[in-house]
């Protein structure tokens, strides 16, 4: 299997169904390198990364897709972002003492809520919310699409702390098959075959092998893979803008409280940005410079 992170689209020639597969290794490892997550949390975060990458691949937009899960349990927050140029990042909040070995989504995130946000550069923001119901994240997402006025969509996800993989099938508007019964039969046939794929096979097999294993009797067109990379969009400029939005009085108060330097830490990548009194003065003097103060991880 290729070790380059990628998503790859495929189409069935004889029916109105498309698919997407995603493989994350390096970017997944970079996300995990930023925080020492327990294994069950790392696995769930990997599934979220794969899911967001799959969803982003089905959309034609310029902007950001955010997948966020909140709960009252040991993992109160999971958050993953995937941009339209296929850059991903993610984080989790957890209570280590409350996490048992082998815990799944329902144990980690009871009474959870999943929010899907599509934030385009231009146009209206979209947000969908669904309860975290189901055995796993794939089932929860599949249920969301089944219960909303969306195209029928199914997910298969797995992650093991080293690799995150995902498979998506989505029924398209009627074109090749017009008869509703034929469309439903085709959809059920393809998803039933996908249900035979084990979690271990999803992690171990490359895309071509997975598709042959499931659909060797179907006519499938596999498109060129698209790269995915880890990238954190934090910057010194964004941090400076956040301080400006607080106002000069609050920033000066923070300088006093933090003994002469305001510290801003990125929750995603742990990058640290420091602003001393001179930096803050420049911000509010309109100098347009955030200065050369050191940053560190």
Curated annotation (Swiss-Prot):
Belongs to the HSP33 family. It holds the Pfam family HSP33. Under oxidizing conditions two disulfide bonds are formed involving the reactive cysteines. Under reducing conditions zinc is bound to the reactive cysteines and the protein is inactive. GO terms for biological process: protein refolding. It is found in: Cytoplasm. Disulfide bonds join 232-234, 266-269. This is 33 kDa chaperonin. GO terms for cellular component: cytoplasm. Redox regulated molecular chaperone. Protects both thermally unfolding and oxidatively damaged proteins from irreversible aggregation. Plays an important role in the bacterial defense system toward oxidative stress. Keywords: Chaperone, Cytoplasm, Disulfide bond, Redox-active center, Stress response, Zinc. GO terms for molecular function: protein folding chaperone; unfolded protein binding. CDD domains: Hsp33 (cd00498). It comes from Pseudomonas paraeruginosa (strain DSM 24068 / PA7) (Pseudomonas aeruginosa (strain PA7)).
């Amino acid at each position: 299997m290729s070790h380059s992170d990628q998503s790859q689209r495929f189409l069935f020639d004889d029916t109105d169904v498309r698919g997407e597969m995603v493989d994350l290794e390096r970017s997944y490892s970079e996300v995990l390198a930023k925080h020492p997550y327990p294994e069950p949390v790392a696995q769930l975060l990997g599934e979220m990364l794969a899911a967001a990458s799959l969803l982003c691949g089905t959309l034609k937009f310029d902007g950001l897709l955010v997948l966020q899960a909140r709960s009252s349990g040991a993992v109160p927050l999971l958050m993953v972002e995937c941009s339209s140029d296929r850059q991903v990042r993610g984080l989790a909040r957890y209570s280590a003492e409350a996490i048992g070995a082998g815990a799944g989504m329902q144990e980690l995130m009871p009474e959870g809520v999943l929010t899907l946000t599509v934030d385009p550069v231009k146009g209206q923001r979209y947000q969908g919310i669904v309860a975290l119901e189901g055995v796993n994240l794939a089932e929860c997402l599949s249920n969301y699409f089944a219960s909303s006025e969306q195209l029928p969509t199914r997910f298969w996800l797995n992650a093991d702390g080293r690799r995150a993989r995902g498979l998506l099938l989505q029924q398209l508007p009627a074109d090749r098959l017009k008869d509703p019964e034929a469309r439903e039969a085709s959809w059920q046939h393809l998803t039933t075959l996908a249900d035979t794929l084990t979690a271990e096979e999803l992690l171990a097999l490359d895309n071509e092998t997975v598709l042959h294993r499931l659909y060797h009797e179907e006519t499938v067109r596999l498109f060129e893979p698209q790269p995915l990379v880890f990238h954190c969009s934090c910057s010194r400029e964004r941090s400076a803008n956040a301080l400006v939005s607080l106002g000069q009085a609050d920033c000066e108060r923070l300088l006093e409280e933090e003994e002469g330097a305001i510290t801003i830490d990125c929750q995603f990548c742990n990058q640290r940005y420091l602003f001393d009194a001179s930096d803050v003065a420049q911000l509010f003097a309109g100098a347009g410079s955030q200065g050369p103060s050191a940053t560190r991880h």
